[in-house]
C-alpha cells in the first residue's frame, strides 16, 4: 500500500521538531529558572509533558507509515531512526518512574520504621501535678499588670505575603527533572537532525 510520502513525512518531521523544541525549552528553563519558580510551575509542566508525549507518538506513527507504506526503494534508514524516538523516550521515562517509585517506597518504609522505633523508645509518662503554691495567683497584681501593658494592634498593612518555601526534596526533584529533560533531548535532537538531513538528501545521495 502506497501513501503520500510528502504528507506523512511533513507531519512526522514537524511533530518531531515541535517535540524537540519543547524539550529544549524545558532544559533551558530547568537550568535557568530558580527552584521556587519551578515548583510553582509543576502542574503546567505536567500538562506540557503530556502534549509533548502526544506529539512524539504522532511523529513515530507517521514515520512508521512513511517507512512501511512506501515502496522498497523509498524506505530510508532515517525513517526508522525517527520512528524510534518515541519508544526510546517512553522506555526511559518508564525506567525512571519505576526506579523513583522503588526509591520512594524504601524511603517511606524507612521513615515508618524510624517513627515506630521513636514511639517505642519514649513511653508516655504521667504529667506531674502542679504544686499548691504554684496555683495561688495574686489577682490584684495580675490586674495591674494587664492595665499597664500596652495594647498592640496588628493592621492589615503589617501582613507580609508568605513566600513559597523550597524544601530540599523539591530542589532535588527540580534538578532531577532538568537531568531527565536533557537525556530525553538527545534522541529527539538526533532523530530530528537525521530526518532533516534525510529529507534533504533523498534526491541527491540515493
UniProtKB/Swiss-Prot annotation:
Topological category with respect to the lipid bilayer: Multi-pass membrane protein
Q: Which GO CC terms are listed, alphabetically?
A: mitochondrial outer membrane
Fetch the InterPro entries from UniProt. ATG33 (IPR051668)
Where located?
A: Mitochondrion membrane
- Supply one GO BP term: autophagy of mitochondrion
Q: Which chain regions cross the lipid bilayer?
A: 13-35, 51-71, 77-97, 181-201
Does the keyword field hold Magnesium?
A: no
Presence of the UniProt keyword Transit peptide in the record: no
- Its primary localisation, in coarse terms, equals mitochondrion
* General function of this protein: Involved in the selective degradation of mitochondria via autophagy during starvation and at post-log phase.
Task: Identify this protein by name.
Answer: Autophagy-related protein 33
Source organism per UniProt: Lachancea thermotolerans (strain ATCC 56472 / CBS 6340 / NRRL Y-8284) (Yeast)
The gene it comes from is ATG33
Amino acid at each position: 500500500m502506497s501513501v503520500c510520502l510528502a504528507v506523512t513525512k511533513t507531519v512526522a518531521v514537524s511533530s518531531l521538531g515541535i517535540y524537540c523544541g519543547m524539550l529544549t525549552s524545558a532544559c533551558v528553563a530547568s537550568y535557568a529558572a530558580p527552584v521556587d519558580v519551578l515548583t510553582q510551575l509543576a502542574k503546567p509542566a505536567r500538562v506540557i509533558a503530556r502534549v509533548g508525549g502526544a506529539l512524539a507518538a504522532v511523529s513515530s506513527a507517521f514515520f512508521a507509515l512513511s517507512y512501511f507504506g512506501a515502496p522498497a526503494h523509498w524506505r530510508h534508514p532515517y525513517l526508522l531512526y525517527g520512528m524510534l524516538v518515541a519508544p526510546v523516550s517512553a522506555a526511559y521515562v518508564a525506567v525512571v518512574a519505576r526506579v523513583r517509585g522503588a526509591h520512594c517506597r524504601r524511603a517511606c518504609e524507612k521513615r515508618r520504621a524510624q517513627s515506630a522505633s521513636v514511639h517505642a523508645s519514649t513511653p508516655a509518662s504521667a504529667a506531674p501535678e502542679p504544686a499548691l503554691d504554684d496555683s495561688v495567683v495574686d489577682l490584684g497584681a495580675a490586674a495591674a499588670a494587664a492595665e499597664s501593658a500596652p495594647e498592640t494592634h496588628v493592621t492589615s498593612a503589617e501582613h507580609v505575603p508568605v513566600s513559597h518555601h523550597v524544601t530540599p526534596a523539591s530542589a532535588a526533584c527540580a534538578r532531577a527533572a532538568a537531568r531527565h529533560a536533557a537525556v530525553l533531548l538527545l534522541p529527539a535532537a538526533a532523530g530530528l537532525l537525521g530526518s532533516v538531513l534525510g529529507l534533504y538528501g533523498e534526491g541527491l545521495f540515493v
